[in-house]
Structures are given as structure tokens and as C-alpha cells.
From Swiss-Prot:
NCBIfam families: PRK11779.1 (NF008746)
Domain called Exonuclease: residue spans: 12-193
Cysteine disulfide partners in this protein: none
EC id: 3.1.11.1
Name of this protein: Exodeoxyribonuclease I
Any Pfam family the entry gives: RNase_T
Species the sequence originates in: Buchnera aphidicola subsp. Baizongia pistaciae (strain Bp)
Positions bound to substrate: 17
Cofactor list: Mg(2+)
The protein's role, per its UniProt record: Degrades single-stranded DNA (ssDNA) in a highly processive manner. Also functions as a DNA deoxyribophosphodiesterase that releases deoxyribose-phosphate moieties following the cleavage of DNA at an apurinic/apyrimidinic (AP) site by either an AP endonuclease or AP lyase.
Length: 481
């Protein structure tokens, strides 16, 4: 679909700043978003929300230094994560919204899913329901650099490799980006990069807009013909110009979102010899990945294009060994046994190992909630702030575990005796003497490292005091309820 014909569509550019890098374990500190029409005219005003962390969490000191956002600041000007999640969910669930970030597919979207999961909101519907979709400007910019670099300034690192950092790209192209690692500033910069690409490369912009959804991407893929397509990804690295020719060979028999393909830049004969010699019982994922088997997640907006997009001058510029690709393709087509062997191997291996530990925050990807489970989750929202009276034992056990943590974090007065005991034990594990010593030593080392940097020292001292305050406040909240 031509983007100009979709007049009801809006873009929502967004960004998080966080207290750490792990989407399941770390917490958000700031969210910002701007909504625009398809011509990048801003609708309404920028939305900015700060979020203070729950008491069972230690912010990463280095992340605080990067963003300049301290937990003290968020406690003064922010909301708790439950209120934070509800506000974001209401923005994301507006129909016909394309939700866009910069490296959001692998970072911000993962934080979104986990934030919604912890707070009884659907982790996935926001990105596909009611005509919604998602898109990543970093991947689009990378595709632009690989395919049609003319007209955009490409900054360089010290080793002369291209830099796709948001701050560097913005500076090189006269895009205002006042404060790096500030969500509001990053959002404006991301929007203007999208605008730049659409102005300079309208055909490329429209092509990848059309093929941003799983449904559209599937039309580019034929696993039966063994015809190659071009794949552009950070996976290949700047050394390989982020590009390779791949051959789709089959759909993963367990996860239908995974396209199993062969990388034609690798030694295909080695792959064939390996599967001829080895029983599937002696094969593992690491080995096949190193040899050139590629898993492409079609629900993550991969950059896939027909081979005819690559012109002769592109092959020369990108130093593509086209003869190698052709020879490997001939080999593959002569050895159709590989497809059967791969399928048998993939069927013999269970799904990716599920997390079986006690921390429910890490269990989002263990499985989808059922339709019945999702109805229970909706009921939790509708009955709050009263305590819902449901026999959680009848449902997915994660719901009960999440609910106990939810009450402990936001309504500790509602905990019964056994739940309170669980909460205290969890807290004592996180804030054990050894953990606190290690954490405080890390802060002290950073204070020494940045002793001449007033801002950093102030942030670290605030963090030191915050930990003391949190420990004191936790004990108070438990023993006064």
C-alpha cells in the first residue's frame, strides 16, 4: 500500500530511558512520544512520563550516569510503573498507529512487552491489533546506507566505519538533537530522521513501509523454489556491509515466526558435508549458526528485498562476491536432502529452554497466556484497587505470582501473611549484605573515577542515599501494614 493513500494512519515515535539494559529485570525511568500524520505534522503535544522504580530493585549506576535521570528525580516527578504502563498502553492502543523507535525492535519494544506483562496488560496486541504495526528507524536507516546512500551524510567512527548512532547521524545531517539519552530529544531526532529518509529516498521509504508487517514480508518469501533474497541486518556487521544473499529453505517446525535460511556468503559445501557426516543427535544450534544457517524472525520487521534491487554498481560498491553466491546456490539446489535433514534436526530439539527459576519477571516468554487467562487478567484491572477474589490456582501460575508482586510493589497493605513472608524473603535476597556491599563498592569506584565530574558525582551520591532510603522505607512499609 502506498503510504500516501493511507490517510487514517498516524505515526507514534517513542523512546525509553531506563535504569538498566535488561528488559525483564530492569526498570524504565522515562517515556516520551510524539504522534504525527503520514507527512510528519505533529498531532497534539509531546507526551513525557517519568517512572520511579519499585523498592525491590537496584538501578544500574552506569545507566543513571548515561541518562542523568536519578531514582530520586523520578520519585519527585514520576509515577509508579503501574500508572506508567496504563498511560503508555492507552497511547499505543489507538487504532491505525504505526509505532516507531530507533533500535526499538530489540530494545524499547522489549521493555514495552515486559512493562505490560508485569502490570497485567497485553504484551503483544499493541503492535498488531486494530490496524497497528511497528517499525524501526535504525533498520530503515541501515537499509538506506546499504542500498541507496546518496543524499544523506554518513558520519564515521575513528576506524572509518560508518556510525549509525542517533546522535552522530543527527549531527551529520543538521538534525536537532539537544540531549543524547533523553527520551524527548531522541524522539524528535528519530522523527526527523524518518522525515529525512522520506524526503531523500521516497521510493525506499515507501517500499519498506509496505513490507514492515509480517503479512507483507511473507509475500517476499518462497521456501519451495530455493530462490535467493537479500537480507540486510546488523547481524552481518559493518565489515560485511550489513548485507548478504540468503536462500529461504523452510519454516521452523516449532516456531512459525522463524524463517530458516542459508547464508550464501558462507561455505555451503561445509554445511552439506557436515549434515552428510553427522547424525542429527550430534548437532547443536551453535554449530549450524557458525556454518551459515540463519534464523530470521518475520515478526521483527526484517529487511528483506528481492535480488533485482541490487544493481551491478551496488555489487561493486558493496564488494559482493556474486560468483560465490551463484556457486553456493547451485550446490544447494543439487542437494535437496539438506532441507529434510534440517527439518528433522529442528523437530528433534525441543523449544528454546524455558526459564524454570522462581522469578516470575523472567517468565514472559515461557508461553502465551490463554484466552481464559487473559480474561482473568482483564478482571484484575477492572477490580483494582480492591483485591480480586479469584482462585488463581485454576489458571496459569504466573498470574498468581505476578499478582503477589504487584500487590507487594503497589499495595503492600493488601498482602496476607504468607504473601508478606514471600515478599520479605525476595527483598532480603536482592538486598542481601553481599549484594549491597558489591553495589555500594561499585558506586564508590565510580565516584573516584568521576571525581572531577560534578554532575556524575552528584548522581552517584544521590543513588547511594536512595539505596539507604529504600531499605529503610521497605521495612517501614512492611511492618506498619
Amino acid at each position: 500500500m502506498d503510504i500516501q493513500k493511507n490517510t487514517s494512519l498516524t505515526f507514534l515515535f517513542y523512546d525509553y530511558e531506563t535504569f538498566g539494559k535488561n528488559p525483564a529485570l530492569d526498570k524504565p525511568s522515562q517515556f516520551s512520544c510524539i504522534q504525527t500524520d503520514i507527512d510528519f505534522n505533529i498531532i497534539g503535544s509531546i507526551q513525557e512520563i517519568f517512572c520511579y522504580p519499585s523498592v525491590d530493585y537496584l538501578p544500574d549506576p552506569e545507566s543513571v550516569l548515561i541518562t542523568g535521570i536519578s531514582p530520586k528525580y523520578t520519585s519527585l516527578f514520576g509515577v509508579n510503573e503501574f500508572e506508567f504502563a496504563k498511560k503508555i498502553y492507552s497511547l499505543f492502543m489507538k487504532s491505525d498507529t504505526c509505532i516507531i523507535g530507533y533500535n526499538n525492535i530489540y530494545f524499547d519494544d522489549e521493555f514495552t512487552r515486559n512493562i505490560f506483562y508485569r502490570n497485567f496488560l497485553n504484551s503483544y496486541e499493541w503492535s498488531w491489533k486494530n490496524g497497528n504495526s511497528r517499525w524501526d528507524m535504525l533498520d530503515l536507516l541501515r537499509a538506506c546506507y546499504v542500498l541507496r546512500p546518496e543524499g544523506i551524510n554518513w558520519p564515521r567512527n575513528e576506524d572509518n566505519s560508518v556510525s549509525l548512532r542517533l546522535s552522530d547521524i543527527s549531527l551529520a545531517n543538521n538534525i536537532v538533537h539537544n540531549v543524547a539519552h533523553n527520551a524527548s530529544s531522541d524522539v524528535y531526532a528519530t522523527m526527523n530522521i524518518a522525515k529525512l529518509i522520506k524526503q531523500k529516498k521516497p521510493k525506499l521509504f515507501n517500499f519498506f513501509f509496505k513490507y514492515r508487517t509480517k503479512k507483507a514480508i511473507l509475500t517476499l518469501i518462497d521456501v519451495n523454489s530455493l530462490n535467493p533474497i537479500v537480507y540486510i541486518s546488523r547481524f552481518f556487521g559493518v565489515v560485511n556491509r550489513y548485507i548478504s544473499y540468503i536462500v529461504p529453505i523452510l519454516w521452523h517446525p516449532i516456531n512459525s515466526n522463524i524463517l530458516v535460511s542459508i547464508d550464501l556468503s558462507q561455505d555451503v559445501q561445509k554445511i552439506l558435508n557436515f549434515f552428510k557426516r553427522n547424525s542429527i543427535l550430534n548437532v547443536n544450534y551453535k554449530e549450524i549458526f557458525l556454518m551459515g544457517i540463519r534464523f530470521i524472525y518475520v515478526n521483527r520487521c526484517p529487511i528483506l528485498i528481492p535480488t533485482n534491487v541490487i544493481r551491478m554498481k551496488d555489487r561493486i560498491r558493496l564488494r559482493i562476491n556474486y560468483k560465490l553466491f551463484q556457486n553456493n546456490l547451485v550446490l544447494l539446489r543439487k542437494n535437496i536432502f539438506l532441507k529434510k535433514k534440517l527439518k528433522k534436526f529442528l523437530c528433534s530439539i525441543a523449544e528454546a529452554p524455558k526459564y524454570n527459576g522462581s522469578n516470575v519477571d523472567l517468565k514472559m516468554y515461557n508461553s502465551f497466556f490463554s484466552y481464559i487467562d487473559n480474561n482473568v487478567i482483564k478482571n484484575i484491572h477492572s477490580t483494582l484497587p480492591k483485591r480480586i477474589k479469584i482462585n488463581f490456582m485454576k489458571y496459569d501460575n504466573r498470574i498468581n505470582q505476578l499478582f503477589i508482586l504487584f500487590l507487594a510493589r503497589y499495595r503492600p497493605d493488601m498482602l496476607d501473611y504468607s504473601e508478606k513472608y514471600f515478599w520479605i524473603q525476595r527483598y532480603l535476597n536482592i538486598f542481601s549484605y553481599a549484594n549491597i556491599q558489591k553495589y555500594e563498592n561499585k558506586i564508590l569506584k565510580l565516584i573516584v573515577k568521576y571525581k572531577n565530574h560534578v554532575r556524575n558525582v552528584q548522581l552517584l551520591e544521590e543513588l547511594f542515599e536512595y539505596v539507604k532510603y529504600t531499605r529503610k522505607n521497605f521495612l517501614k512499609s512492611i511492618f506498619t501494614n
